[in-house]
Amino acid sequence: MISSIDSIMYNLSILNERNEKVNYGLSTGESLQNGSDDSMKFDYILGIQNDTSMYSSIQEGINYSDTFSTASDSALAEIKTATESIIAEIIKANTDTTNQEGKESIALEIEGYKELLFSLANSQSNGEYLFSGINSDSQSFVMDDTTGQVSYQSDNSLKSVNVEENRYISQGVNGIDVFYYTNNSAEATDTFTFTSNEIIIDEDNNQWKLMDSDNDGVDDGLFLNGDISSSSMSFTTNADGSFTATNSTGNTLDIKHSIFDDLDDLTNALNLEDSSGNTITSDEASIILSDSLDKLNDAYDSQNTSHSLVGSRTNSIDTFSSIVQSKLTNLAILENEYASADLTALAVEAQALENTYTALYSTINRVNDLSLVKYLS
């Protein structure tokens, strides 16, 4: 009798345990109540959920980057429009029909365009500077309060976007791409001349910077990416304040010139002055105007190239966005397949459990009806 009761109670406990899991599945829609129910399935589900979390984070970053890309595209469109207007003003100024008063009026227009370009050069999106490369929390360009010279404050790096596990791709362009153009190139061992506001880039996109390595207030070498612990290129200072160096890098160097410096030269020429404020002749000014037209066309070409790069890099990011979204969709399907309960099967099992409960309790009742005397007899 005792053995029968123990057996019945054991079966009842198993039944209760299974019934709890069935009810959990029906109420939550989840296939596992505890990881120990099926450790292999549980580990697989955890892997899916971890991947989902990772790709969701990547997708959020890509979505956030959309605003940056859109802002970069819009800023470059405005920059190009302003440069087109400047080129038109140069052409108008360099004609016989435009007198000196008209040229001085154009000089004021050019100064206005310079201010506009300076503002656009420091465009931001969600607090990030569009043209500072990886240093997007720092202002891209500054203007000297005394001379009005505009200089780039960042480096030749690019902002990047996480598009896959451990994979990043470039986004946008930097200030060198947009507001500088190649003014000269120097092959290995060639001698080249440059100014303090020009930027020197090698074939590996490294920047060679004038640096004061001993803190004596005087620049004493061109250092790779501004690293004063590295080997440097020596230079000599020329009478006009420019510098001359010999390319000892073994690579081709590009000397990048700023559109802002060209605008300063252009404004001075329109006012019949040189960079020091000395008076120049109209013939000398005409030569500068012609040179400025060529330089501004080169600058405009760089802007077009930069705009194209923004577009192609944005398209690459969009392609990865579609891939990430597809992965998230597939992961959701997999998680649903492995983590979701089969409600139809559980409903059938619940009915079977109910029938089993009925039969088991019927047995328990019959056993309870048996008295010890009846049992012994």
Predicted regions and their residues:
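Cysteine-poor, low-complexity segments in flexible/peripheral regions
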Residues: 139-284
